[in-house]
Amino acid sequence: MAKLPKITSLLPHSRVVSGIQPTGIPHIGNYLGSLKQWVQLQEEAARTPFSKCFFFVADLHALTVPQDPLKFRQARLDMLAALLAIGINPQKSTLFFQSDVAQHSELAWLLACSTSMGQLNRMTQWKSKLHLHDHDDLSFLDASATSSTRFNLGLFSYPVLQAADILLYGATHIPVGKDQSQHVELTRSIARSFNSSYKEKILTVPDIILNSSSSIMALCQPEKKMSKSDINSKNYILLSDSTGEIRKKISRAQTDNIKGITYGDSNRPGINNLINIFAAISDSTPSDIAQANASCSNAEFKEKVSSAIIRCLQPISTSFNEWRQNRELLRDIAKKGAEEAVAEASSCMHKLKTLTGLSVY
């Protein structure tokens, strides 16, 4: 994989774009791994001349797996409420539902027509969704009835729609975690290829803003990433969890019998995970957290981690519940955000249609 440029600060005329699927109320891993960074970028963009953030609920992407319509409708509103609760401000950022802006799908088709099957075949996300190995390809599905029944075009072409999400708004910066950089690389490749085909630099090739925080792992099984879809609810902490639920889940988190708090020992994945959570919440480093708590017992350290999480999430949880109860206001915010997004997206598509010969106006 080619090395992507990393950006640590915004310059004038910057545009930040990112989305999150409405697969349930976000957990602390979502917050520390990406959403907290969104708020920081929003504030930085507000201080940077002619800069703008576009954040959206990626509901079209969520349809690559079956959804119950009633639950899905609520999940979309819950995610919007969660984004507002963590500090995304519609006065500073454009906040909207992806499905409310038809130009996402329109641009995805244009990009799909210049994206090779080989490029998509090399993507790892659709393989991980089907529990395949990174080196597997489409031919493997012919021999795997189980995988092929769960495989659809939407899942395979997911990265093309994601590229459209980014390129539609002239994104200059994309905040991502370490495991998502492959899709940004593909987006950059698609943009360069499209520009080359039409001999005009019409699509902006975005740079990456890499979140340096360590991945947050499952509390009871720290060898795997924290996930809302985990059947064991003890493995994750939701932004809406109560104080009691947070303390109970942290107290039951996997640790070990080794005395003292140390960081980096591969034999202590549970302690490493708790240190990473504590460090990300307190804007510190794992080594500093370990050093400051070196003499603590595991139980004492868990209590400190619980208290730090509660201080961080309690105002978010309160705000989330307030937003969640005001469905009409949520719809108004989404509608206004969609109008802003459509205005931007329409301008981009008009230029692209003119360039590709689709427009006669």
From Swiss-Prot:
Motif ('HIGH' region) on chain: 22-30
Classification via Pfam families: tRNA-synt_1b
Gene Ontology CC annotation, any one: mitochondrion
EC number: 6.1.1.2
Main location, first listed in the record: mitochondrion
Transmembrane segments: none
An MF annotation (GO) of this entry: ATP binding
Motif ('KMSKS' region): 225-229
Binding-site list for L-tryptophan: 165
PANTHER family per record: TRYPTOPHAN--TRNA LIGASE, MITOCHONDRIAL
Record's subunit section: Homodimer.
Protein name as catalogued: Tryptophan--tRNA ligase, mitochondrial
